[in-house]
Amino acid sequence: MTIKSDKWIRRMAREQGMIEPFVERQVRTEGSERLISYGVSSYGYDVRCADEFKVFTNIHSATVDPKNFDERSFVDVKGAVCIIPPNSFALARTVEYFRIPRNVLTICLGKSTYARCGIIVNVTPLEPEWEGHVTLEFSNTTTLPAKIYANEGVAQMLFLESDEPCEVSYKDRGGKYQGQTGVTLPKT
């Protein structure tokens, strides 16, 4: 597998609609305001977080069960900033909608700006032929409330191209998160 460059990412976004909306350069400021960067980087794409969040609360449940998840465990928040309570987490989604090619696996890594503040971003790989908004998981590992900024960079996508297409893609197997929009909760 080879990692794909900024040139390839731009071409795939333009010709195949791989990333929409797409920002062709790295954005670090808006007017005089400094931002957490987003857009194309040398070997990846820095995604933005939309302004829709689900913040975890333990009011309705004593146990977190991925097979029987209680939607009431989240409080919906919409805004330019989301505050995650200490030692808690929140879900969000990318501004960008992705369409992953059949011969590509996409890996997501958190941005150092957040990691150095104790905020961890987790996303499972975007599999071949998966498409949708990416659900982002933010963990606040600190003992203080933590801020997440909407419409700014939160994670970087790395695109790995295989030397041959897979036999069965995510789309072929009817993956449960195919075509997801908005913040998507766990499914079994």
Curated annotation (Swiss-Prot):
This is dCTP deaminase. It catalyses: dCTP + H2O + H(+) = dUTP + NH4(+). Pathway: Pyrimidine metabolism; dUMP biosynthesis; dUMP from dCTP (dUTP route): step 1/2. Keywords: Hydrolase, Nucleotide metabolism, Nucleotide-binding. One of its GO terms (biological process) is nucleobase-containing small molecule interconversion. Gene3D superfamilies: 2.70.40.10. The keyword Membrane does not apply. Belongs to the dCTP deaminase family. GO terms for molecular function: dCTP deaminase activity; nucleotide binding. DCTP binds at residues 111-116, 135-137, 156, 170, 180. Homotrimer. The active site is at residue 137. The lineage of its organism: Bacteria, Pseudomonadati, Pseudomonadota, Gammaproteobacteria, Pseudomonadales. Its EC number is 3.5.4.13. It holds the Pfam family DCD. Catalyzes the deamination of dCTP to dUTP. It comes from the Bacteria. The keyword Hydrolase applies. CDD domains: trimeric_dUTPase.
